[in-house]
From Swiss-Prot:
Keyword hit for Ribonucleoprotein: no
Residues that coordinate or bind Mg(2+): 44, 83, 115
Cofactor stoichiometry and binding remark: Binds 1 Mg(2+) ion per subunit.
Organism ancestry: Bacteria, Pseudomonadati, Campylobacterota, Epsilonproteobacteria, Campylobacterales
PANTHER family (UniProt xref): 3-METHYL-2-OXOBUTANOATE HYDROXYMETHYLTRANSFERASE
Protein name from the UniProt record: 3-methyl-2-oxobutanoate hydroxymethyltransferase
Catalysed conversion reaction: 3-methyl-2-oxobutanoate + (6R)-5,10-methylene-5,6,7,8-tetrahydrofolate + H2O = 2-dehydropantoate + (6S)-5,6,7,8-tetrahydrofolate
Main subcellular location of this protein, as a coarse class: cytoplasm
Keywords: Cytoplasm, Magnesium, Metal-binding, Pantothenate biosynthesis, Transferase
Chain residues that bind 3-methyl-2-oxobutanoate: 44-45, 83, 113
GO terms for MF: 3-methyl-2-oxobutanoate hydroxymethyltransferase activity; magnesium ion binding
One matching Pfam family: Pantoate_transf
Cofactor(s), names only, from the UniProt record: Mg(2+)
């Protein structure tokens, strides 16, 4: 039976961790599905990981659709989540709905992910009202890398931390059913997770999120040119074993540890957030 957003809300209520992995092809999707990974994200990170691009900004809708089709064929139980690429939803309401629907109709995804907060809340509302589950993404948002000045931890001061909290509330109110929180201080992610009713999925944001996500290639140590602080290599000899280790460590709370997280907020500053 296919996993659903309802089941992930139930996991949050029961304090059971949600597992997510970014993957881009049929065979890796089969492995993740067999390992009972909850969500397979067909991330626009494939631009760099698979296609050798410098960032995620150049990958197209057609390219994302092809890879999402492959993952959907391999995943029978896992929820397949498709990343909407840069400028596929920001430009107009019409583009947002039409492109989101293409992932469902053509690539058989189960939901879509978008980056941004208050500024795209109206797009989230339109897509979700059309019956498509929407996952939001805050903190370090790679599609806004030129605005952020690079790949840096976000929410390190009172103003930026409060902005992320306000954005999180806005996307939930707009109809987002899950939130990815990338590269924010541990205590900020914990605060967001406690405020929201929807599940949070962390990457570089500490152990208090309702789940975790890593890229398939990264957790297996397949990319020797990339090793971010928040990445842990589990097993590159046997992918199935590596994924199972990742799954078990997320569910038990072993991963992520402090060494895979960022902490810039003191308790005095945290108390000022609302």
């Amino acid at each position: 039976m296919r996993k659903s957003m309802i089941s992930f809300l139930e996991k949050k209520a029961k304090n059971e961790k949600i597992t997510m992995v970014s993957a881009y092809d049929y065979h890796s999707a089969k492995i993740l599905d067999n390992c009972d990974i909850d969500i397979i994200l067909v991330g626009d990170s494939l631009a760099m990981t698979v296609l050798g691009m410098q960032d995620t900004l150049s990958v197209t809708m057609d390219e994302m659709l092809i890879f999402t089709k492959a993952v959907s064929r391999g995943a029978k139980k896992s929820f397949v989540l498709a990343d909407m690429p840069f400028m596929s939803y920001q430009s107009s309401d019409r583009d947002a709905i039409l492109n989101a629907s293409r992932f469902i109709k053509e690539s058989h995804a189960n939901g879509v992910k978008v980056e941004g907060g208050i500024e795209i809340a109206s797009k989230i509302k339109l897509i979700s009202q059309s019956g498509i589950p929407v996952v939001a993404h805050l903190g370090l948002t790679p599609q806004a890398v030129n605005m952020l000045g690079g790949y840096r931890v976000q929410g390190k001061d009172l103003q930026s931390a409060q902005k992320i909290i306000d954005d999180a509330k806005a996307v939930q109110d707009a109809g987002a059913c899950m939130l990815v929180v990338e590269c924010v201080p541990v205590k900020l992610a914990q605060k967001i997770s406690s405020i929201l009713e929807i599940p949070t999925i962390g990457i570089g944001s500490g152990k208090y999120c309702d789940g975790q996500v890593l890229v398939y290639h990264d957790l297996l140590g397949l990319n020797k040119d990339f090793k971010a602080k928040f990445v842990k290599h589990f097993d590159k000899i046997d992918p199935q074993v590596g994924v199972e280790k990742y799954r078990d460590e997320v569910k038990s709370g072993i991963f992520p540890s402090q060494e895979h997280s960022f902490d810039y907020l003191d308790d005095e500053l945290l108390d000022k957030l609302y």
